[in-house]
Amino acid sequence: MKKFTLSIICILITLPLIAQEPLFNGSDLDGWNIHGTELWYVDNGLLVCESGPDKGYGYLSTSNYYDDFDLTLEFKQESNGNSGVFIRSTVEGTKVSGWQVEVAPPGSDTGGVYESYGRGWLIKPEKEKDKALKMGEWNTMRIRVVGDQIESWLNDTPMIKFVDKKIGQGKGSIALQIHDGGGIKVRWRNLLVTPL
């Protein structure tokens, strides 16, 4: 009986540690920081990023840092839709140091990993995986980062699995990007992170 009770206590203590945490509350940008002049706002419970008058890069980063985690989110691209999800990243002004899991129009390597202000493309998905993207519809992306390994999925399709020492040394927040050039609008919902 003591072993059973101890097992139950261990499970109850561990559950909150592996529970999903919402990154977006559906009503405001509490817990986030805006970088740049591009537009980030809430519309009918959805998080929206949209090109502003400067047509520059813009970022929305979490106030908290996340090292090892499993992130799921949904996005819907409108217009050009070029965006991304940064991991273990820091932002100064509109310069981000870190790694982006690409969110882009068809044929532009959604799910691949790009290192900003560094080595550029680290890995792109195989071309046939591009059909997993549903332009103009809701898409589900999953990103798992543990140590020096990153994996991404798009609508349950495995996109990449990559190991990199530099990523393993990274520290920082999760950030959403709006690309420069103007004419971009992306809607986001159900951003859930599980710290590991």
Q: Predicted regions: what is each one?
A:
Residues 4-15:
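Sec-dependent N-terminal signal peptides
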Residues 19-196:
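Carbohydrate-interacting regions of secretory-pathway proteins
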